């Protein structure tokens, strides 16, 4: 817990270039992961399942924003 009794927030995760490349590669093939695949990727990249899950959630939101921006241009 922090100084005022509130739980401390985790620091921002930074991914290596290799991890990012592998995650992007996986996202290119599949925007959603099965639990089994998430476990495999987590082990391969030395990350937690939770980090993989959140990375994919964030990446889907990024894609959604990008698609919305392209739609507005056209």
UniProtKB/Swiss-Prot annotation:
Keywords associated with the record: Developmental protein, DNA-binding, Homeobox, Nucleus
Cellular-component GO terms for this entry: nucleus
Single GO molecular function: RNA polymerase II cis-regulatory region sequence-specific DNA binding
Pfam families associated with the record: Homeodomain
Domain of life: Eukaryota
Listed InterPro entries: Antp_homeobox, HD, HD_metazoa, Homeobox_CS, Homeodomain-like_sf
Annotated region of DNA binding: 8-67
CDD domains: homeodomain
One biological process term in Gene Ontology: negative regulation of transcription by RNA polymerase II
Localization: Nucleus
Gene3D superfamilies listed in its UniProt record: Homeodomain-like
Family according to the record: Belongs to the Antp homeobox family.
Function description: Sequence-specific transcription factor which is part of a developmental regulatory system that provides cells with specific positional identities on the anterior-posterior axis.
Name of this chain's protein: Homeobox protein abdominal-A homolog
UniProt gene name: ABD-A
């Amino acid at each position: 817990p922090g100084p005022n009794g509130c739980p401390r927030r985790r620091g921002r995760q930074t991914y290596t270039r290799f991890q990012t490349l592998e995650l992007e590669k996986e996202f290119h093939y599949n925007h959603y992961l099965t639990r089994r695949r998430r476990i495999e990727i987590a082990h391969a990249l030395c990350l937690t399942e939770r980090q993989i899950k959140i990375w994919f959630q964030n990446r889907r939101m990024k894609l959604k924003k990008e698609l919305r921006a392209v739609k507005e241009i056209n």
